[in-house]
Structure formats: structure tokens, C-alpha cells
């Protein structure tokens, strides 16, 4: 069972911003920028090349929605999206507000974000999603 499955099942804490029957989105605990969100299918699938095309389409659709929300929440014109597939064996899409290419780097993540910063990001993204609905 992956760490993401444990978060989805509420066995570990997660700051969720979106949930439906197939896909969830929650904040990463090591953000590249404030608002860095992971979009994850509930089904534990190791790699994006192995996912059913319909489910992958749903994951991408939710990623697009989260991208719009993080742009609105953090006043950016762009949202970055990365599929790395190396750190956790459970398909996930990194979506984050960005202002420059320098934001695209796992070497620059905040390894110890404050709980308040994560709570603020969660609230902002949820509010932006409500406005987009």
C-alpha cells in the first residue's frame, strides 16, 4: 500500500482540496511553491503509462481544474504540471502556481513548510475552487 493510499484512506493526515469518486487532490508536504498540490487517482496505479485512458483523462481534467484554482488562489498567470513518477509508486500529478522556470525544481522544495502556510494554501485553493464551480 502506497503512502498516498494511506492518505486517501485517512490512515495518514492530508490537506485535501478536492475529492470525487475516482480522484483526489491534496497539498504536498514538500512544496516547490505555496499551493503545490498533488492530483492522485484513488486506484493505486504505479505509472502513468499503465493507467486506463479514461481514468487518466479524469486525472488530467482534475489537474486542469486544480491548475486554474492555484492560479486564482495565488495570483499567477501560470500553473506548472509535472509527472515525475519516481518518488512514490502511485500515479500523481504535481500542479503548482509558478512565476518562472526556477520554480520547476525538486531540489528547491521547502522541506519544512509551516503548518500555517499549508493551512492557508488549502483554504485559498478551496475558496478558488468554490468560485470556479
UniProtKB/Swiss-Prot annotation:
Motif (Histidine triad motif): 90-94
Molecular function via GO: hydrolase activity
Domain HIT: 3-106
Highest taxon of source: Bacteria
GO cellular component, one term: cytoplasm
Pfam families: HIT (PF01230)
SUPFAM superfamilies named in the record: HIT-like
Disulfide bond residue pairs: none
Protein name: Uncharacterized HIT-like protein Rv0759c
